[in-house]
A protein has these predicted regions:
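Penicillin-recognizing serine hydrolase domain
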Residues: 1-140
Length: 140
């Protein structure tokens, strides 16, 4: 991870202390946007289309049973987005939605949230979706 982060200029991305806990990778919204920028403008077309196609085809329910139709994936038009979730470090729910919100691929949005465990996953999803809707509206 350190090699790729250095190559792509992602100064705030760090591997987790325990490599088996990939969900504890530290990153910033800025680094997420820089990574998407690399995918959109720095990769061969075939590789870019493979990644964006997979993101755009994300199912509403993830393999682990978690509902991921929130944030950028909850709105219209359909987005190409990577969702992230984890509970409950320091009493917080971590819920992220980052990707390309428009079919023209003109914009990249990174929504990274850490919310009190008490709001529950439904409340956390609603918050991230509300923010995604607010961000997406002026981009249309």
């Amino acid at each position: 991870m350190a090699r790729v982060a250095a190559r792509l200029g992602l100064p705030e991305t760090r591997a987790p202390r325990d490599p088996s806990q990939w969900g504890e990778t530290v990153l910033s919204a800025r680094d997420v946007v820089l990574l998407y920028d690399h995918v959109l403008s720095g990769m061969p077309t075939e590789d870019r289309e493979l990644i964006i196609g997979a993101l755009a085809a994300a199912p509403p329910i993830a393999t682990d049973g978690f509902g991921q139709a929130f944030g950028l994936l909850a709105g219209a038009p359909p987005a190409a987005s990577k969702q992230g979730w984890m509970c409950c470090q320091a009493g917080q729910i971590t819920l992220h939605s980052a990707g390309i919100p428009d079919p023209g691929r003109r914009f990249v949005v990174a929504l990274l949230s850490s919310q009190p465990r008490g709001v529950g996953y439904d409340g956390a999803r609603d918050t991230v979706t509300d923010v995604a809707d607010a961000v997406r509206a002026p981009l249309a």
